[in-house]
Amino acid sequence: MELLLLSNSTLPGKAWLEHALPLIANQLNGRRSAVFIPFAGVTQTWDEYTDKTAEVLAPLGINVTGIHRVADPLAAIEKAEIIIVGGGNTFQLLKESRERGLLAPMADRVKRGALYIGWSAGANLACPTIRTTNDMPIVDPNGFDALDLFPLQINPHFTNALPEGHKGETREQRIRELLVVAPELTVIGLPEGNWIQVSNGQAVLGGPNTTWVFKAGEEAVALEAGHRF
């Protein structure tokens, strides 16, 4: 499988998806036809989100079609060489994808050669479940099971920092709560600016920041760019 799982879409001082464009270009391998899954967009319309994505990726020669615009979404997924899943609200993304019957077809198409690109919520959707999203559950997705393309759980936008005086849980504390009730899981705390690239059977960590791996009953382990999962 070919996956590009990005923690986030924007870095300080850079345009939207700017840091991801070289990564996308290097993994295209001649692919040009893409479907975009905009369902995580809540405060922007799906048309706006699709147009924004198409404009940014056009210089790479990628032709982007919004899945909500086509008459036959299943046929569009079958024909797609690239499946792009945008960030936003993960619960909304999963709900809309499930209700349209797109989860199994997307997973199957990626397993048969389509490139999967997802940032933030889109990275969460590639995991076995969405249980490590940071998002508010604004809708009920009728279950947390997701695409299960990547075997570990990703927590995007990972940071353990708290504002001065804040008394809420750290991100690690929230992840530890999950591991109490689901000790079989492994969670990757993927900070902004980092990504996981899967190609030719290898999953490799990229980016300038330290990534953390959490397992039940164990201390967190720090990983740096180049680590192979």
Swiss-Prot record:
Listed A to Z, the keywords are: Cytoplasm, Dipeptidase, Hydrolase, Protease, Serine protease
Query: What would be one Pfam family of this protein?
Result: Peptidase_S51
Gene Ontology terms: cellular component: cytoplasm
Q: Where is the active site?
A: S120 (charge relay system), D135 (charge relay system), H157 (charge relay system)
Catalytic activity from the UniProt record: Dipeptidase E catalyzes the hydrolysis of dipeptides Asp-|-Xaa. It does not act on peptides with N-terminal Glu, Asn or Gln, nor does it cleave isoaspartyl peptides
Identify the main location: cytoplasm
GO BP: any one term: proteolysis
Molecular functions per Gene Ontology: dipeptidase activity; serine-type peptidase activity
> Where is the chain membrane-spanning?
none
- UniProt xrefs under Gene3D superfamilies: 3.40.50.880
Question: HAMAP family, alphabetically?
Answer: Peptidase_E
Recorded family membership: Belongs to the peptidase S51 family.
Name recorded for this polypeptide: Peptidase E
